Protein backbone atom coordinates (compact mmCIF):
# COMPACT_ATOMS: atom_id res chain seq x y z
CA UNK A 1 0.00 0.00 0.00
CA UNK A 2 2.78 2.41 0.95
CA UNK A 3 4.79 1.42 -2.10
CA UNK A 4 1.94 2.37 -4.40
CA UNK A 5 1.75 5.81 -2.77
CA UNK A 6 5.47 6.35 -3.32
CA UNK A 7 5.22 5.10 -6.89
CA UNK A 8 2.22 7.30 -7.59
CA UNK A 9 3.90 10.42 -6.20
CA UNK A 10 7.08 9.68 -8.18
CA UNK A 11 5.09 9.16 -11.41
CA UNK A 12 3.15 12.35 -10.80
CA UNK A 13 6.31 14.39 -10.32
CA UNK A 14 7.89 12.92 -13.46
CA UNK A 15 4.80 13.55 -15.56
CA UNK A 16 4.56 17.12 -14.32
CA UNK A 17 8.10 17.87 -15.44
CA UNK A 18 7.54 16.18 -18.80
CA UNK A 19 4.46 18.23 -19.49
CA UNK A 20 6.24 21.48 -18.71
CA UNK A 21 9.07 20.77 -21.15
CA UNK A 22 8.62 21.44 -24.85
CA UNK A 23 8.56 18.38 -27.08
CA UNK A 24 10.97 19.83 -29.66
CA UNK A 25 13.72 22.34 -29.14
CA UNK A 26 13.94 24.79 -31.98
CA UNK A 27 17.22 26.67 -32.23
CA UNK A 28 16.92 30.41 -32.01
CA UNK A 29 17.02 31.91 -35.45
CA UNK A 30 18.23 35.35 -36.25
CA UNK A 31 16.02 37.16 -38.73
CA UNK A 32 17.69 39.60 -41.01
CA UNK A 33 16.12 42.43 -42.90
CA UNK A 34 17.08 40.87 -46.23
CA UNK A 35 15.01 37.67 -45.88
CA UNK A 36 11.38 37.90 -44.93
CA UNK A 37 10.53 34.23 -45.30
CA UNK A 38 7.69 33.29 -43.01
CA UNK A 39 6.03 29.94 -42.35
CA UNK A 40 2.93 31.31 -44.07
CA UNK A 41 4.77 32.13 -47.28
CA UNK A 42 3.34 29.07 -49.07
CA UNK A 43 -0.19 30.09 -48.13
CA UNK A 44 0.42 33.65 -49.28
CA UNK A 45 1.52 32.42 -52.69
CA UNK A 46 -1.72 30.55 -53.29
CA UNK A 47 -4.59 32.22 -55.00
CA UNK A 48 -7.41 33.08 -52.62
CA UNK A 49 -9.96 31.96 -55.19
CA UNK A 50 -8.55 28.42 -55.22
CA UNK A 51 -8.69 28.28 -51.43
CA UNK A 52 -12.28 29.50 -51.40
CA UNK A 53 -13.41 27.02 -54.04
CA UNK A 54 -11.70 24.17 -52.19
CA UNK A 55 -13.51 25.03 -48.97
CA UNK A 56 -16.83 25.40 -50.79
CA UNK A 57 -16.47 21.95 -52.29
CA UNK A 58 -15.77 20.49 -48.86
CA UNK A 59 -18.81 22.14 -47.28
CA UNK A 60 -21.15 21.16 -50.11
CA UNK A 61 -20.56 17.44 -49.63
CA UNK A 62 -23.27 15.44 -47.96
CA UNK A 63 -22.84 14.14 -44.45
CA UNK A 64 -22.50 10.61 -45.79
CA UNK A 65 -20.03 9.50 -48.41
CA UNK A 66 -20.57 5.82 -49.06
CA UNK A 67 -22.03 4.58 -52.31
CA UNK A 68 -24.60 2.48 -50.49
CA UNK A 69 -25.95 5.53 -48.66
CA UNK A 70 -26.10 7.45 -51.95
CA UNK A 71 -27.98 4.59 -53.59
CA UNK A 72 -30.42 4.38 -50.68
CA UNK A 73 -31.19 8.08 -51.01
CA UNK A 74 -31.92 7.68 -54.72
CA UNK A 75 -34.12 4.65 -54.11
CA UNK A 76 -36.08 6.45 -51.41
CA UNK A 77 -36.57 9.45 -53.72
CA UNK A 78 -37.94 7.20 -56.44
CA UNK A 79 -40.20 5.36 -53.99
CA UNK A 80 -41.55 8.66 -52.68
CA UNK A 81 -42.23 9.88 -56.19
CA UNK A 82 -43.95 6.63 -57.09
CA UNK A 83 -46.20 6.59 -54.06
CA UNK A 84 -47.10 10.25 -54.57
CA UNK A 85 -47.91 9.56 -58.22
CA UNK A 86 -50.47 6.96 -57.14
CA UNK A 87 -52.62 9.95 -56.17
CA UNK A 88 -52.92 10.80 -59.87
CA UNK A 89 -54.99 7.65 -60.22
CA UNK A 90 -57.42 9.14 -57.71
CA UNK A 91 -57.63 12.33 -59.76
CA UNK A 92 -58.43 10.33 -62.89
CA UNK A 93 -61.13 8.36 -61.08
CA UNK A 94 -62.56 11.61 -59.70
CA UNK A 95 -62.79 13.20 -63.14
CA UNK A 96 -64.51 10.10 -64.46
CA UNK A 97 -67.04 10.19 -61.62
CA UNK A 98 -67.77 13.90 -62.21
CA UNK A 99 -68.61 13.39 -65.87
CA UNK A 100 -70.49 10.15 -65.16
CA UNK A 101 -72.68 12.10 -62.75
CA UNK A 102 -73.13 14.81 -65.42
CA UNK A 103 -74.32 12.26 -67.98
CA UNK A 104 -76.62 10.65 -65.42
CA UNK A 105 -78.10 14.02 -64.42
CA UNK A 106 -78.65 15.14 -68.02
CA UNK A 107 -80.29 11.79 -68.82
CA UNK A 108 -82.71 12.25 -65.91
CA UNK A 109 -83.49 15.91 -66.55
CA UNK A 110 -82.40 17.28 -69.95
CA UNK A 111 -83.76 20.76 -69.13
CA UNK A 112 -80.96 21.37 -66.56
CA UNK A 113 -78.23 20.52 -69.03
CA UNK A 114 -76.49 23.96 -68.93
CA UNK A 115 -76.52 24.28 -65.15
CA UNK A 116 -75.31 20.70 -64.64
CA UNK A 117 -72.53 21.24 -67.16
CA UNK A 118 -71.25 24.32 -65.27
CA UNK A 119 -71.27 22.31 -62.03
CA UNK A 120 -69.42 19.49 -63.78
CA UNK A 121 -66.74 21.88 -65.04
CA UNK A 122 -66.33 23.28 -61.51
CA UNK A 123 -65.97 19.74 -60.10
CA UNK A 124 -63.50 18.89 -62.87
CA UNK A 125 -61.40 21.93 -61.94
CA UNK A 126 -61.31 20.95 -58.26
CA UNK A 127 -60.33 17.35 -59.00
CA UNK A 128 -57.70 18.45 -61.52
CA UNK A 129 -56.23 20.89 -58.97
CA UNK A 130 -55.80 18.04 -56.50
CA UNK A 131 -54.13 15.97 -59.23
CA UNK A 132 -51.72 18.77 -60.11
CA UNK A 133 -50.91 19.30 -56.44
CA UNK A 134 -50.12 15.59 -56.16
CA UNK A 135 -47.90 15.77 -59.23
CA UNK A 136 -46.06 18.74 -57.73
CA UNK A 137 -45.44 16.81 -54.50
CA UNK A 138 -44.14 13.84 -56.50
CA UNK A 139 -41.69 16.01 -58.44
CA UNK A 140 -40.55 17.76 -55.28
CA UNK A 141 -39.86 14.37 -53.70
CA UNK A 142 -37.78 13.37 -56.70
CA UNK A 143 -35.71 16.50 -57.31
CA UNK A 144 -35.00 17.82 -53.81
Swiss-Prot record:
It is found in: Mitochondrion membrane. Pfam families: ATP-synt_C. The record marks 128 as: Reversibly protonated during proton transport. CDD domains: ATP-synt_Fo_c_ATP5G3 (cd18182). It comes from the Eukaryota. Residues 1-63 form a transit peptide. GO terms for cellular component: mitochondrial membrane; proton-transporting ATP synthase complex; proton-transporting two-sector ATPase complex, proton-transporting domain. InterPro entries: ATP_synth_F0_csu, ATP_synth_F0_csu_DDCD_BS, ATP_synth_F0_csu_sf, ATPase_proteolipid_c-like_dom, F/V-ATP_Csub_sf. GO terms for molecular function: lipid binding; proton transmembrane transporter activity. One of its GO terms (biological process) is proton motive force-driven ATP synthesis. Keywords: CF(0), Hydrogen ion transport, Ion transport, Lipid-binding, Membrane, Mitochondrion, Transit peptide, Transmembrane, Transmembrane helix, Transport. It is a multi-pass membrane protein. The chain crosses the membrane at residues 83-103, 120-140. Mitochondrial membrane ATP synthase (F(1)F(0) ATP synthase or Complex V) produces ATP from ADP in the presence of a proton gradient across the membrane which is generated by electron transport complexes of the respiratory chain. F-type ATPases consist of two structural domains, F(1) - containing the extramembraneous catalytic core and F(0) - containing the membrane proton channel, linked together by a central stalk and a peripheral stalk. During catalysis, ATP synthesis in the catalytic domain of F(1) is coupled via a rotary mechanism of the central stalk subunits to proton translocation. F-type ATPases have 2 components, CF(1) - the catalytic core - and CF(0) - the membrane proton channel. CF(1) has five subunits: alpha(3), beta(3), gamma(1), delta(1), epsilon(1). CF(0) has three main subunits: a, b and c. Belongs to the ATPase C chain family. PANTHER family: ATP SYNTHASE LIPID-BINDING PROTEIN, MITOCHONDRIAL, ATP SYNTHASE SUBUNIT 9, MITOCHONDRIAL. This is ATP synthase subunit 9, mitochondrial. It comes from Podospora anserina (Pleurage anserina).
Amino acid sequence: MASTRVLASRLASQMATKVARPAVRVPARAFTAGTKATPLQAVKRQQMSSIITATRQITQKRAYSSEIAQAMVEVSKNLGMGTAAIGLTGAGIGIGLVFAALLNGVARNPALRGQLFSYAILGFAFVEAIGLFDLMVALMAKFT
